[in-house]
Amino acid sequence: MSSSLLTDLVNLDLSESTDKVIAEYIWVGGTGMDVRSKARTLSGPVDDPSKLPKWNFDGSSTGQATGDDSEVILHPQAIFRDPFRKGKNILVMCDCYAPNGEPIPTNNRYNAARIFSHPDVKAEEPWYGIEQEYTLLQKHINWPLGWPLGGYPGPQGPYYCAAGADKSYGRDIVDAHYKACLFAGINISGINAEVMPGQWEFQIGPVVGVSAGDHVWVARYILERITEIAGVVVSFDPKPIPGDWNGAGAHTNYSTKSMRSNGGYEVIKKAIKKLGMRHREHIAAYGDGNERRLTGRHETADINNFVWGVANRGASVRVGRDTEKDGKGYFEDRRPASNMDPYLVTAMIAETTILWEPSHGHGHGQSNGK
C-alpha cells in the first residue's frame, strides 16, 4: 500500500459520510505509569463524559486483574478533542473499577476526586501548574536523542532553552505535542528544552482540582502517540542517565484562594510547614526511583531533608520572589519525580495543606478528609 494512500486514509474526514464518531478510551495501566487505550464507535458526537457508555478491558493483560476474573470496568471521566483523528472524534480519560463498582487499587483518581470534592477543599479552589520533564531516547538503544552512540555529549550548559542542531534534539516532536495538546483542549501553558540534552519539559496549568491529573495524563498519552509516530521513545525516568546530568522532575506549583488573597504569604508559610511535617509520606508517593534524582545536586534538595526557601532551586519547596514581594501567590513543590501520578500528588498536597491537622507537632496527625 503506497504511503500517500495510507496517509490519505488516516486523514479521511468522516463527517462527509457518517455521523458516527470514534472515541479513544484512555486509562492508566498496572505499573501506574503505562498509559493504555482502545477505541470504539459512537453513534454521534458526545461532549459530556456522563453520557458516554462504560466499557471494560482484560485487566489480566495490564497487571490489574487475575486471569480467572479479568474484567475491569472503565468509567469515562473527561473528554478531549482527538488531535490524531480530528473532526468530532474524541479522547476519553477513564478510571478503573472492579465489576462490583469498587475502584481497583491502581485507581488514584477515585481518591483524588474524593479529596477535591471535600467542602473545605472546594472552597479553596486549589490551582495547580505541573512542569512535566521527560527525556527522548533513540529507539532500540535507549540512549538520549542527539547523543553519540555509546558516548556522551559535551557537559551541561549550552542546552537549556537552546537552538541549533548541535544543542537541540527533538524540537519537531515537542512542537507537534504542544499544538496537539492545544487542539485537544488541554491547558498546556508552555514548553522548553531542559538542562540535559535530549530532555524537554511541558507545563500544564493552571488547572483546578482533579482536572489537573486528567490534563497531565492525556498530555502524556498524546506525547506517547507522537513519539510512536516519530520512532522515538519517551522516558519519564527521574534519572535516565547516571552521573553529572540533571534528573527529570514534575515540579508542582500550587495555590489556594487564601494564598492568592491578601495575607496569603502567611497561609503559604503554614502550608509549607505542614508539608515539612509529612515529608516522608509525600516522598513515598512522589514517584519511583526519586532517590536517584533527589541527591542535593543538579538543582535538587536531598531526599532525606526538607528545606524551603525563596528563589532557591536547591530547596524541596521554593517560593518565588514575586510571591514574597506581593505577600500572596503560590509555591512550588520541587520534590515530585517525572514519573509521579498527578492524581496522587495533587490530592496529597491539597489534603496535607487544607485538611490535615498535626497532632502534638508530629508528622502523624489526622486528616479531616475521611
Curated annotation (Swiss-Prot):
UniProt subcellular location: Cytoplasm
Pfam families linked: Gln-synt_C, Gln-synt_N
Tissue expression summary: Expressed at low levels in spikelets (rice flower).
Residue span(s) of domain GS beta-grasp: 21-101
Recorded GO MF terms: ATP binding; glutamine synthetase activity
One BP annotation, GO: glutamine biosynthetic process
Residues annotated as domain GS catalytic: 108-370
Function comment: Glutamine synthetase involved in ammonium assimilation.
Classification via PANTHER family: GLUTAMINE SYNTHETASE, GLUTAMINE SYNTHETASE CYTOSOLIC ISOZYME 1-3
Protein name from the UniProt record: Glutamine synthetase cytosolic isozyme 1-3
Organism: Oryza sativa subsp. japonica
Gene coding for it: GLN1-3
